[in-house]
Amino acid sequence: MSDNQSWNSSGSEEDPETESGPPVERCGVLSKWTNYIHGWQDRWVVLKNNTLSYYKSEDETEYGCRGSICLSKAVITPHDFDECRFDISVNDSVWYLRAQDPEHRQQWVDAIEQHKTESGYGSESSLRRHGSMVSLVSGASGYSATSTSSFKKGHSLREKLAEMETFRDILCRQVDTLQKYFDVCADAVSKDELQRDKVVEDDEDDFPTTRSDGDFLHNTNGNKEKLFPHVTPKGINGIDFKGEAITFKATTAGILATLSHCIELMVKREESWQKRHDREVEKRRRVEEAYKNVMEELKKKPRFGGPDYEEGPNSLINEEEFFDAVEAALDRQDKIEEQSQSEKVRLHWPTSLPSGDTFSSVGTHRFVQKPYSRSSSMSSIDLVSASDDVHRFSSQVEEMVQNHMNYSLQDVGGDANWQLVVEEGEMKVYRREVEENGIVLDPLKATHAVKGVTGHEVCNYFWNVDVRNDWETTIENFHVVETLADNAIIVYQTHKRVWPASQRDVLYLSAIRKIPALTENDPETWIVCNFSVDHDSAPLNNRCVRAKINIAMICQTLVSPPEGDQEISRDNILCKITYVANVNPGGWAPASVLRAVAKREYPKFLKRFTSYVQEKTAGKPILF
């Protein structure tokens, strides 16, 4: 036992010269991909004790980490295209990280690899430490571990080992007996030699016998046996050498037989273990094959939420999967909106309208409407003319309004190449396919006719930001950046993210105008013109792709005379709507996806918005 302990102790010692120092700890700010809504966010990352942890900021480290992963079996993969990005994956968990520049990325990757190497999966010193622990355990447990595991079902082998212990004791006793015999013999020989030497010295003075050749010869032959009688060692006469020999032969034969039996048992055990090993190998082969098939299937499907599958120049998602993902996200938004609308209807309580004059607010501008009579006309509405409001974008607004009035109201026939994509009742949606540098710039034109509302009412609800969230379901948030005039504002708005497409934002000037009629037969016309501008208060940001728009909502009111002397009611009015949209979405969304989404969403928008205006104006005085 002492030998085993000493061997284990020596084997567990490590060479201090080859033992490397602990890996260096590291901390700093990295951009981490949080989710498809918020995208990349700066996080305080700490690399310590083979663990990578991240916090929301350096000041919040005392509140605990937001997440951590062990680097023992982590796979670090620098990105192929993004020189600042690297991914860390452990089983199904993947962290997407970005450094400030390629140099910082390499420093982080090297530090993480060093921690991973020293974690026990790849370090020679770690392998030595693990081996030493195994040897200590095996040396300390001895036969007890063997008897409780490998020999749990092999009692015959243990019995044979006990027999060999008995044979060893017999052989040891025989060796002790022989050793005693040899020791006594050695003592007897030593005493005999001393006695012989003494007798020879006493007889040196005796006369020698004279031979015929004159030489002298001592007469010792006749007295030799008398002088040196045969000495027999005392105390060994009781040894039965023949019996000991028989016992020795039987003992060795028993040892050989027992060893043979032990070998036979071990061979049988080895065959049993070999069969179990073969079965486990076959199971492992089947599992690995199934795992390989699953991984191949997973490679075919996008990892939802990962930055590699979002919109971008190096996106791994194909157009079909891109469209499926966008369509699924839009369906979810529609369901949420339906639930929200049903909840609003359930909680809605009608409010009474005050009698007398009705006031309608358009921004901060006020219109006063008197009850309409046959003697009155549309020009009886007191309106501050839009041309009286002058601001730094006035010339651009005038140009945009004139262009839309000249071109947007033209017929879709001729050489314009307008394609009818949707037709539902009075609503028709046309499109012209235009691409520039791979970006879809399809102009869209829709015509619609809505009963019971005026063009002024439709444009009022379309322009007024106070009611924007009541009918617009695609906006995440918005705010008025600057009020240029009573009828012109600059608005910044961000649209809801539809994964895997990038989030879009828009900065645009919105102006509402009444277009004077050139003749008595011309219908009353209102227009809302929205077009992109630049403003210092809303610069570009990395979270959103800035879209460029040029949109016009042109509404003409047609009145059919009532019968007799009756006043005009909503049954006598019809609003003819022309909606024109020129949108540059930017980014890298596939053209087929953008066209499919536009074909789906624009008709839904017109129906939803016009239904909202009809609902809000029902039962209210007409606003011409």
Curated annotation (Swiss-Prot):
- Keywords for this entry? Coiled coil, Cytoplasm, Endoplasmic reticulum, Golgi apparatus, Lipid transport, Lipid-binding, Phosphoprotein, Transport
| Cited Pfam families | PH, START
**What catalytic activity does the UniProt entry give for this protein?**
N-hexadecanoylsphing-4-enine(in) = N-hexadecanoylsphing-4-enine(out)
Q: What CDD domains is this protein classified in?
A: PH_GPBP, START_STARD11-like
Segments forming domain START:
389-618
Q: What does this protein do?
A: Shelters ceramides and diacylglycerol lipids inside its START domain and mediates the intracellular trafficking of ceramides and diacylglycerol lipids in a non-vesicular manner.
Motif FFAT positions after renumbering to this chain: 321-327
Q: Which ranges form a coiled coil?
A: 263-303
Q: Where is this region: Disordered?
A: 1-24, 202-221
Q: Name one GO cellular component term.
A: membrane
Q: How is it modified after translation?
A: Phosphorylation on Ser-132 decreases the affinity toward phosphatidylinositol 4-phosphate at Golgi membranes and reduces ceramide transfer activity. Inactivated by hyperphosphorylation of serine residues by CSNK1G2/CK1 that triggers dissociation from the Golgi complex, thus down-regulating ER-to-Golgi transport of ceramide and sphingomyelin synthesis.
Question: Which is a GO BP term held by this UniProt record?
Answer: intermembrane sphingolipid transfer
Task: Write out the annotated subcellular location.
Answer: Cytoplasm; Golgi apparatus; Endoplasmic reticulum
The record's note on its domains: The START domain recognizes ceramides and diacylglycerol lipids, interacts with membranes, and mediates the intermembrane transfer of ceramides and diacylglycerol lipids. The PH domain targets the Golgi apparatus.
Record's InterPro entries?
Answer: PH-like_dom_sf, PH_domain, STARD11_START, START-like_dom_sf, START_lipid-bd_dom, START_lipid_transfer
On this chain, the residues bearing Phosphoserine are S126, S132, S135, S315, S373, S377, S380
The protein's name is Ceramide transfer protein
